[in-house]
């Protein structure tokens, strides 16, 4: 049968993988891991990665879901060489192949009504037989071609489908277990399993990496490929991802959408690093650069056991990348969160300056953005517990002394601010805590923050002194 490639298939490309999501919802972490494994295997073998949108479910597929999938792939920086291809734009190709299969006796029209099929199923169940089509229409000729019908693939009735799964090893399925699959519906639309076969053939896919829920589809697809005289890809069915309670990962475990992790403040580098370790590893190594993943990844080394999603581990990785990536790169991602939380970061220190300071305490960019407000916005409220502890009348004297000494500073440096704090404590004969804690609450409104010499340096001289004076006025009003 004639092969119609969508692009010039380079005969020197030994590996061509694909990611083929259905646009019926967001890109979830399971799909993202499948995409990552496919992408890594292609890159490891100097191959190509194809993106295909399997949108044959016309009722459930939406443009919004397609956009969300593409956004997720781009955010994860999983670039594709070919695509995205949409199955709904290839119906003519699928039907062309189906018509040729009918002509060659590889498929046949089935005119059976729903009632007949239901009666057949009921009869087989009564006789404790596995429900399957009885090929009643295979040799029928009295029906007009244009009468309502489906098209079925003529599946072999003898023999066994055998394939060596790259993850699970050898799998064998008897053809007696397989039915004559419907490959075209009554409305003329081709079915999912058939579209996948033609796409993998046309696109020269050599390795199919997908979830274990597709294992049952594989022998059916292999039989169609064999009937077409097409090469059979290597299949790799990866395990599901469970929550930390052992149950299938779902919304009740927290975020499951890739972009939801973005919204929660995770870096794409952290999520990629975490996902690659959910089923694959290299010794005891936990941190992998993208270059290391490409160099080391092998689909044959992926575990066939289910993996458990651990949010604490992801947070640990995220904090690592917040600290270790180039600060300008982290700042680019942080900008999105600052805008989302309504923080005008042009009115204060550069984001690159606050990231090293706050990332010691924050595990996500969302936390970091929220924690940074006092660098860019006036303090309107004070933490109540901190007020009760640190804004007593005796705090006025060290605050006033601080304001006086800080005002006199000509060089606003961390070292000079720290020296002012030490001098204030010495001159008033009090501990540094009696100076630092009221100072912190005055400048940040909080009971906790990075060290105050660094914090005040970033807040700026005028704002720092103004906030100290506001705090003194506040303490006076609380103790009238």
Swiss-Prot record:
Belongs to the class-I aminoacyl-tRNA synthetase family. Glutamate--tRNA ligase type 1 subfamily. Zn(2+) binds at residues 110, 112, 137, 139. It comes from Histophilus somni (strain 129Pt) (Haemophilus somnus). This is Glutamate--tRNA ligase. Its EC number is 6.1.1.17. Catalyzes the attachment of glutamate to tRNA(Glu) in a two-step reaction: glutamate is first activated by ATP to form Glu-AMP and then transferred to the acceptor end of tRNA(Glu). Binds 1 zinc ion per subunit. A motif ('KMSKS' region) lies at residues 248-252. GO terms for biological process: glutamyl-tRNA aminoacylation. GO terms for molecular function: ATP binding; glutamate-tRNA ligase activity; tRNA binding; zinc ion binding. ATP binds at residue 251. Keywords: Aminoacyl-tRNA synthetase, ATP-binding, Cytoplasm, Ligase, Metal-binding, Nucleotide-binding, Protein biosynthesis, Zinc. GO terms for cellular component: cytosol. A motif ('HIGH' region) lies at residues 21-31. Monomer. Its cofactor is Zn(2+). The lineage of its organism: Bacteria, Pseudomonadati, Pseudomonadota, Gammaproteobacteria, Pasteurellales. It is found in: Cytoplasm. PROSITE patterns: AA_TRNA_LIGASE_I. Disulfide bonds: none annotated.
């Amino acid at each position: 049968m004639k092969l119609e490639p969508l692009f010039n298939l380079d005969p020197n490309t030994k590996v061509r993988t694909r990611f083929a999501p259905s646009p019926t919802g967001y890109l979830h972490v399971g799909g993202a891991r499948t995409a990552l494994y496919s992408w890594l295997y292609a890159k490891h073998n100097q191959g190509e990665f194809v993106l295909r949108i399997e949108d044959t479910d016309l009722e459930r597929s939406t443009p919004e879901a397609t956009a969300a999938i593409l956004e997720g792939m781009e955010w994860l920086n999983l670039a594709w060489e070919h695509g995205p291809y949409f199955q709904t734009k290839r119906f003519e190709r699928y039907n062309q192949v189906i018509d040729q299969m009918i002509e060659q006796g590889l498929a046949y029209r089935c005119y059976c009504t729903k009632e007949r099929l239901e009666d057949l199923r009921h009869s087989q169940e009564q006789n404790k037989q596995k429900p399957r089509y009885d090929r009643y229409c295979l040799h029928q000729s009295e029906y007009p071609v244009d009468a309502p019908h489906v098209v079925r693939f003529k599946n072999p009735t003898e023999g066994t489908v055998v394939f060596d799964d790259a993850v699970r090893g050898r799998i064998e399925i008897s053809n007696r277990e397989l039915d004559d699959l419907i490959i075209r519906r009554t409305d003329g639309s081709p079915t999912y399993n058939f579209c996948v076969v033609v796409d993998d053939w046309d696109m020269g896919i050599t390795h199919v990496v997908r979830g274990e829920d597709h294992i049952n589809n594989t022998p059916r697809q292999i039989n169609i490929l064999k009937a077409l005289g097409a090469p059979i890809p290597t299949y790799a069915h990866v395990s599901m991802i469970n929550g930390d309670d052992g149950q299938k990962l779902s919304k009740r475990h927290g975020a499951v959408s890739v972009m939801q992790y973005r919204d929660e403040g995770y870096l794409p580098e952290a999520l990629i690093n975490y996902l690659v370790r959910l089923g694959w590893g290299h010794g005891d190594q936990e941190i992998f650069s993208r270059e290391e993943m490409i160099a080391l990844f092998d689909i044959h080394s992926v575990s066939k056991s289910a993996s458990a999603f651990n949010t604490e581990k992801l947070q640990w990785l995220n904090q690592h990348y917040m600290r270790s990536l180039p600060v300008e790169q982290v700042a680019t991602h942080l900008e999105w969160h600052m805008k989302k939380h309504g923080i005008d970061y042009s009115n204060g220190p550069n984001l690159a300056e606050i990231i090293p300071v706050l990332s010691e305490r924050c595990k996500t960019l969302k936390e970091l953005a929220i924690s940074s407000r006092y660098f860019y916005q006036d303090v309107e409220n004070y933490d109540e517990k901190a007020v009760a502890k640190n804004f007593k009348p005796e705090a006025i004297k060290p605050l006033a002394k601080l304001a006086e000494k800080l005002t006199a500073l000509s060089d606003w440096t961390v070292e000079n601010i720290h020296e002012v704090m030490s001098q204030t404590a010495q001159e008033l004969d009090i501990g540094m805590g009696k100076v630092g804690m009221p100072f912190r609450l005055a400048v940040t409104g909080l009971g906790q923050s990075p060290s105050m010499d660094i914090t005040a340096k970033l807040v700026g001289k005028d704002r720092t002194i103004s906030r100290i004076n506001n705090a003194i006025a506040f303490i006076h009003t609380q103790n009238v």
